[in-house]
Amino acid sequence: MTRIQASGRSVLDVIRTRRSIPRMKPDPIPREVIEQLLDAAVWAPNHWMTEPWQFFVLEGEAKRCFAEMRRAVHRARLPDPDSPQAQNALEIAYRATLNTPVIIVVTSRVAEDPEVREEDFWATFGAAYAFMLGAWSMGIGTYFRSGALR
């Protein structure tokens, strides 16, 4: 996440102007700010009242482990992972992950019932989006990334 200029924004302005910020400033995000955003996120609509979302706040060693895991996943997808170009790209992505002040991983429990599972998926997305909108309203940029969704 990264700080941007923001103050007194309306909800509509925040929705219209929020953008993904792929390059993060290294400025730390205070823990109390993260907690405020998490508190807002869990108010996302959830028809079945399952509250399926889980938020993992990664800093320090956890962030380093995540960066290594992410590098391994990307490496496995490359046709020639040992080429100099691939090695350079992997290192750049690894460093960018490490330089991000905090990483919030959002997951969802997977219900057996397909209808509940679908609702939980969208409720979790809503919670993540609420987090991002709240961050933007506080002058903090975010970048949404997803892996396999189904």
What are these regions (language model features)?
Residues 41, 104, 110-150:
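Small-aliphatic-rich amphipathic alpha-helix that forms the alpha element of a beta-alpha
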Residues 56-58, 104-107:
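Short, conserved beta-strand edge motifs with alternating hydrophobic and charged residues
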Residues 1-99:
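N-terminal amphipathic, basic helical "cap/leader" segment at the start of enzyme domains
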Residues 65, 92, 103-106, 130:
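Generic beta-strand or strand-like secondary-structure segments
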